[in-house]
Amino acid sequence: MKSLITQVTRSGQVESFHVGYGVIVDASGEIVKAYGDTQYSTYVRSSAKPLQGMAVLRSGAYDNFKMTPEDLAVICSSHSGEPIHTQTVSQVFSEAGIGPELLACGIHPPIHRPSAQALQTAGVAPQQIHNNCSGKHAGMLATCVQLAHSPEDYLNPEHPVQQYIYDIVKEYTSSDEIHRGVDGCSAPVFYLPLQKVAMAFARISKQENQECCQIFQAMSGHPHLVGGEGRFDTALMKSYPEKILSKGGAEAVSAAGFIMPDGQVYGLAVKVLDGNYRAIGQMVLK
C-alpha cells in the first residue's frame, strides 16, 4: 500500500517531502481505501474532541444548562482565541454556574494574531480562556457539575468525568482498553490505530443516534467556532456545508467524517509521520 506523500517544491524542484499514513472506512470500520499502515497507532490529540464533547450530551449537562449548538461547537474546538470564541466559552461557564478560574489547561496567547495583538495593545495578559482547548475543559467542568463530581483534579485520568469520557471513546472506537497519555493541555489523550479513529468519525457523521446528530450538526453548522480564521478544519467544513466533520490535532494528526452525494458516509484519519502540520491539509484532501 502506498503511503501519502506531500512534496515541498522551490522553483520547480522538490526541496522536501513529508510521508504520512491514512485510511478511509465506513461506519462498521471496513476499510475502503488505505494509504500505508492503517493500524499505525498515534496519540489522537485534539481529534478526540468530538468524542470528549459527547460527555456533555450524555451526562445531561447540555439539556440541563440549556446549552446551544454554538456552545457544543466550541466545546469540541481547538479555537483560535478570537473574541467570539472566548465569549462562547464564557457562556458555557455561565450556563453551568461556574467560573473560568477552575480551568487547568494552561495559558498561551490567542492563535489568532490580530486577537493576540489586541490584547498586547490593551496591556491585557492572556488568560486560560484564550487557550485553544478551553472549550473542551469548560465542557469537562460542566459535566462535573452535572454529575455532582468535584472539579478538583478534574484532569486526573482516574477522575470520574475522565473515566466517563474514556468509556465513550472506547465505545465509539470499539476498543476494550486504550493507552492514555497527557495532552498538551494536561487532559488525558488517547493512543489509537488510525482505522479506529476513522471509524469513530464515520459513526458520528452517519448520525446513528441523537448525540452523534448533535455533535455533527453543531460542528459542521458552526465551523468558525471549531477553529477560526485561516484554520484548515474551518475552511474545509465551510466548503462543504453540513456534509463534513473535520477535526485536526497537534503533531499533524487529523480525522474527518463526510457524507457523499449518494448518501454514503465514510470516515478518514491521517497522520503525518514527522509531525509537521504544514503537510496535513494536502494529505487530507488527497
Label for each model-derived stretch:
Residues M1-Q39:
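Beta-lactamase-like hydrolase cores
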Residues S11-V14, H130, K243-G248:
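Short Gly/Pro-enriched turn/cap motifs at secondary-structure boundaries
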Residues F17-G22, A138, Y166, E251-S254:
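Short glycine-rich loop/turn motifs
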Residues Y35-Y43, I75-H79, G123-N131, V182-P188, ...:
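A short glycine/serine-rich beta->alpha loop
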Residues V44-Y62:
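Active-site SXXK
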Residues L57-F65, A96-E101, A148-D153, H159-R180, ...:
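Bacterial peptidoglycan biogenesis and beta-lactam-recognition machinery
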Residues T68-E177, R203:
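Active-site-adjacent helix/loop patches that line small-molecule binding or acyl-intermediate pockets
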Residues A202-K286:
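Structured C-terminal helix/loop/strand segments within mature extracytoplasmic catalytic/sensor domains
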